[in-house]
Amino acid sequence: MSIFKNKTNIKVNVSSEIGRLNAVLLHRPGVEIERMTPLNAHEALYSDILNKNIVDNEYRYFCGVFERITKVFYVSDLLEELLEDDDLCNSLITQSCAAEGCEYLVDELMQQSPKDIAKELIEGFPYRKGKDPERYAERRYVLRPLYNLFFTRDASSSVYDRVLINSMSFDVRKRENLIYKAIFKHYFGCEVINAQEWNSKAHTEGGDVQIGRSDLLCIGEGIRTDAKGIEFLAHTFSNRPKFNIIVQQLPHQPDSFIHLDMVYTFLDRDRCMMYEPMLRKTAEFAGKATTWIEIDGGKVKYHDCKNMLEALKHVGFDMEPVFCGGDDLWVQQREQWHSGANFFALAPGKVIGYRRNSHTIDALDKAGFAVLNAEDVAEGRTNIDDYNRCVVTFAASELPRAGGGARCMTMPINRDNI
């Protein structure tokens, strides 16, 4: 049995969405994001195709902010390190190939260096153009590229001192589960949990899982996270003396509502970013239920709530919302489409998000958040700790076209308790 020796001393500990960030997992978008065409982009879960050169420039300052203020781990680096262990390498390659019906590649991949294997597990392994001309022309990759890997939040979620390996709704992302399970089990040495090991029909994704505090999860129920997945989370934490889960139903269309963090994120102890129709139960959210699940001594009670803010009040959160897109519905819909509600907290009251959503940034400014540029923070000209509340904005026109924002692209590993 393999005993991986290069574990880090950093422990998984995330008990809120806003505690000061001490460590984070990122993935720099690579050539995998261009290995699609308009005809098969939908198979990659994209609604458009991206330009890597532009993405590189946009992501540079995004990750630069994190490198300036916290410990950053990169998926590709950790994967390459894990693959240096022969047993782990064999296991990961075997599982990856079995999942995609190409077991015949195992021996060939095992002959390569850890760096090359990591590259092919992420960027894809092509059919031979001469040997498989039809398949090469139709699909090109026998091991599909991990087009969505830079959305590190989706496939895994730090939940307190454990990591939830999310049971993805689409097969194109299954290999991400295998990679994250290996990373968190062997590199970080933490317990991993998986809804599908409890029920094969259960699905969860990280964009739908938000940690309010040590006794509260907020969960989105929609096209990616289903009722069985929520039942698994309730079951997992039902042994605690008291625990609460707030469930917000999400529309299945359009694609911008795939996760809860596309319409709601925590900004501070008493502030949140929200898509206003979710609060008012209008437009796309008409008829979408909000439920407070109260677990007390193993007994479970269900309470219907008017909206998420009311549900949060029941569990001791008196939140003041800042509305994505300001106060005009058309602008709200435009900016929500490009992840205008999707902010990531670096510390209480200090968040990062897209600059392009100008009406949302103006609303934050009016709510007392100083508006900072990622370029200045990344290069050390501005310190977020000089401000009580701030929003770090980074320029992006290409990244939002992939369908996610700052929270989607970050997997927190360790935060201060608050």
Which residues make up each language-model segment?
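The feature marks the mature, well-folded catalytic cores of soluble enzymes
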Residues: S2-I418
